UniProtKB/Swiss-Prot annotation:
It holds the Pfam family DAP_epimerase. It comes from Brucella abortus (strain 2308). HAMAP family: DAP_epimerase (MF_00197). It catalyses: (2S,6S)-2,6-diaminopimelate = meso-2,6-diaminopimelate. One of its GO terms (biological process) is lysine biosynthetic process via diaminopimelate. This is Diaminopimelate epimerase. The keyword Methyltransferase does not apply.
Length: 303
């Protein structure tokens, strides 16, 4: 078995992704390898999307998702779009079925290059998110930042898109809040036994949401697809918007539709940056034109 595995450095609206080809191999990417790749400025990432051979009949591939701190993740919508683009460039196919820790999902690349991912159905029961204690209504829970009589943030909506999310609603620019300071505190709050993704959301019209996210295991991010989905369904659930919205994240817009069949569709772009090979055990890597390819901009790292 070859030591090195192929990879592509990509991004989904600025969400930094490494798509790793682990097909035909018995090994997995170690936490040490992930942390080493994350610490290198050229390969720094938010998530690794490791493509493995299928484990379940009817699926094309199993996708293991690894955060930049070496922990495992259940879902990554932006990373899934990157996987689709890489596989479409390789195979000529444009529709795929994947299995992740969060379940089975489907994704399609359109003629305009945008990619839609069926993110599955949202879950709202406190046990399913999960929360550490019973909450009757997850549209608004008791959690706040700041003084009790004048909280900076309070009463977030809670949802799971295969991973836990808390969405704090605000009535001014999302950039006016110090998410880098309170994000890690809220991520690790005792109410979230598996930690949580923390977002600040501002509804700017009946079909538009501005969003910033502190991503569990990754920190501040330019885009988090599952957070955009959680914000969209929570906005509809609380009467702030309809069921089809544009969510503006720092990296750009995502179109989110909460369909009548309860599935959440996310549509957005993916972009290839460069290809290489790496050692899944150590994280040692090099550029290699024979690695996974993709469409999008040229190798910006070669300039």
């Amino acid at each position: 078995m070859a030591t090195k595995a192929a990879f592509a450095r990509m991004n989904g609206l600025g969400n930094q992704i490494i798509v790793a080809d682990m097909r035909g191999r018995a090994d997995s990417i170690t936490s040490a390898a992930a942390i080493r790749l994350a610490s290198d400025s050229e390969t720094a990432f938010d998530q690794i999307m490791a493509i493995h051979d299928p484990r379940t009949p009817g699926t094309d591939y199993y996708i293991a998702i690894i955060n930049c701190d070496g922990t495992q993740a259940q879902a990554c919508g932006n990373g899934t779009r990157c996987v689709v683009q890489a596989l479409a460039a390789e195979t000529g196919r444009h529709a795929f079925t994947f299995e992740t820790r969060a379940g089975i999902l489907t994704a399609t690349e359109h003629d305009d290059g945008l990619i839609s991912v069926d993110m599955g159905t949202p879950r709202f029961d406190w046990q399913d998110i999960p929360l550490a204690q019973a909450v009757a209504d997850t549209r608004k829970i008791e959690l706040q930042v700041g003084p009790a009589d004048a909280p900076v943030l309070h009463s977030p909506s809670i949802a799971s898109m295969g991973n836990p999310h808390a969405v704090f609603w605000v009535d001014k620019d999302v950039w006016s809040y110090e998410l880098d300071k309170f994000g890690p505190l809220l991520e690790n709050h005792p109410i979230f036994p598996e930690r949580a993704n923390i977002s600040i959301a501002h509804v700017t019209s009946s079909d538009t949401i501005d969003l910033r996210t502190w991503e569990r295991g990754a920190g501040l991010t330019r885009a988090c697809g599952s957070a955009a989905c959680a914000a969209a369904v929570s906005a509809a659930r609380t009467g702030r918007t309809g069921r089809k919205v544009t969510v503006n994240v720092p990296g750009g817009p995502l179109l989110i539709e909460w369909r009548d069949d309860d599935h959440v569709m996310m549509t957005g772009p993916a972009e290839w940056e460069f290809s290489g090979t790496f050692d899944p055990a150590t994280g040692e890597w090099s550029r290699d034109t024979q690695g996974l390819q993709g469409s999008g901009n040229a190798d910006r790292g070669a300039a």
